[in-house]
Amino acid sequence: MEGNILEIKVLKNYWELGCRVADIVEHTLTLPEPKLVLPTGSTPLSLYKELVNRDLDWSTTTTFNLDEYVINPNHPHSYNSFMKKQLFDRVNIYPDNYHFPFRPTEAFEDKIKEIDLCILGIGSNGHIAFNEPGSSFESRTRVVDLSEQTIEDNSRFFDSIDEVPKQAITMGLGTIMESKKIVLMANGENKLNI
């Protein structure tokens, strides 16, 4: 990570958060062949809306998602479907240039070198991607069992809690920390004490 500088910004509202992070993404997209890591969930929705509204050039950009359920990628609740709906189908990124964690995880690790910008969200129990509290800081991309709290939190995206996948493939904390720049987005009072 460049310079290891920790900067905390408290913003007025959720939409300002999306705009501020969109500024960082827009700057990153000016690099010759930018590589980004992107999150899912409710927190980055304002970011994705703002990025679509800015009509930026994504044609040389490669993206990697932090995680994906162990689920058919075309399932309506997969993160692949989420990202297509929120961003990829609405900007000029080539389908061959966006990637989700896959098995074998070692092959995915080989693809994700030299990340320019990694955007993260944080779960209500402090998980980053699907790295639950207590995950090793050296962890790599791997298949994980989801905690009961994470399954419960994510049930809002499914018709019932029984439909929430019990496993996911996630980038590890060690993998994430190799990014040149990291931005952690957090929104809401429930994230204040994490």
Task: Give short role names for the model-derived ranges.
Residues 25, 31-54:
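Glycine-rich N-terminal segment of FAD-binding domains in flavoprotein oxidoreductases
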Residues 113-138:
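Glycine-rich phosphate-binding loop
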Residues 1-36:
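N-terminal glycine-/serine-/threonine-rich phosphate-binding loop
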Residues 129-173:
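Class I SAM-dependent methyltransferase SAM-binding "motif I" and its flanking Rossmann-like core
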Residues 2-5, 58-119:
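Ligand-binding beta-strand-loop-alpha-helix segment within the catalytic cores
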Residues 38-43, 120-124, 187:
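Glycine-rich beta-strand-to-loop/alpha-helix junction loops that act as flexible
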Residues 48, 59-67, 71-74, 128-132, ...:
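Active-site histidine-anchored catalytic micro-motif
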Residues 174, 178-194:
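ATP/nucleoside-binding phosphotransfer catalytic cores, i.e., glycine-rich phosphate-binding loops
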